[in-house]
Curated annotation (Swiss-Prot):
Record SUPFAM superfamilies: Ribosomal protein S5 domain 2-like
Gene Ontology annotations for the cellular component aspect, listed alphabetically: cytosolic small ribosomal subunit
Family: Belongs to the universal ribosomal protein uS9 family.
Protein name: Small ribosomal subunit protein uS9
PANTHER family to which the protein is assigned, alphabetical: RIBOSOMAL PROTEIN S9 (PTHR21569), SMALL RIBOSOMAL SUBUNIT PROTEIN US9M (PTHR21569:SF1)
Annotated NCBIfam families: PRK00132.1
Residue stretches of biased makeup (Basic residues): 112-131
Gene Ontology molecular function: RNA binding; structural constituent of ribosome
Chain positions covered by the region annotation Disordered: 102-131
Length: 131
């Protein structure tokens, strides 16, 4: 059996990392061996993951097999979106302008700010009393 053609992409967002493989197929999305709807359970997060296909009119052309870990659900959805966009770019470099215009090729650099000593959270100070 011949090796099946597949494209890989890695996405990161906050503390989440997603390793994405695109395989020519009928549009099935599997994350950590679970269906997209079952994994996220929120329509908004499902939409975020599907966005690169909508922008490039490639919906239903590729199956997605992804491994996501770290962070929360929103971070993982963002990481998957970036990973899918990067994999689509490897599959068809002519999609670059559309993906770039939509902002799907940009890694969001915002991270959680570290907690400082003397404070309760990153910026929240303990209650101040004048007397």
């Amino acid at each position: 059996m011949a090796a099946q053609l597949q494209y890989q992409g890695t996405g990161r967002r906050k503390n989440a990392v997603a390793r994405v493989r695109l395989i020519p197929g009928e549009g099935k999305v599997t994350i950590n061996k679970r269906e997209l709807a079952e994994y996220f359970g929120k329509k908004t997060l499902e939409m975020i993951v599907q966005q690169p296909f909508g922008v490039t009119d490639t919906a239903g052309k590729y199956d997605v097999v992804a491994l996501a870990h770290g962070g929360g659900t929103t971070g993982q959805a963002g990481a998957l979106r970036l990973g899918i966009a990067r994999a689509l770019l490897k599959a068809d470099p002519s999609l670059r302008p559309a993906l770039k215009r939509a902002g799907f090729l940009t890694r969001d650099p915002r991270m959680k700010e570290r907690r400082k000593y003397g404070l309760k959270k990153a910026r929240k100070a303990p209650q101040f009393s004048k007397r």
